[in-house]
């Protein structure tokens, strides 16, 4: 007999936004503060963005496809952009995964400051890229 657990059971009936808020609170340190800050900037850049909770605990922001994920590690918070290699980055905000053909990432460490304007520009560019791919 195979026991299947539904998503509702795993998430205890909570919305992805609630789960992301809980993750931020659980972290309880600079990583939670950083995740909260980038979440706020993402929502400011794209008020229509959808928050999702995937892969057993990874916050995901989507609009016409995945824009980015927000993973927290012991030493840093990683924002991975699914199609980051196709996004222009004139400010050099991407600092991880630079050799890949698809993804790019931003690794944020304790004390790092975010170039808010450049970050929002990357979010908008990712949404625009997702939207243009859907229309074809």
Locate each region found by the language model:
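Charge-dense, helix-prone N-terminal extensions
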Residues: 1-136
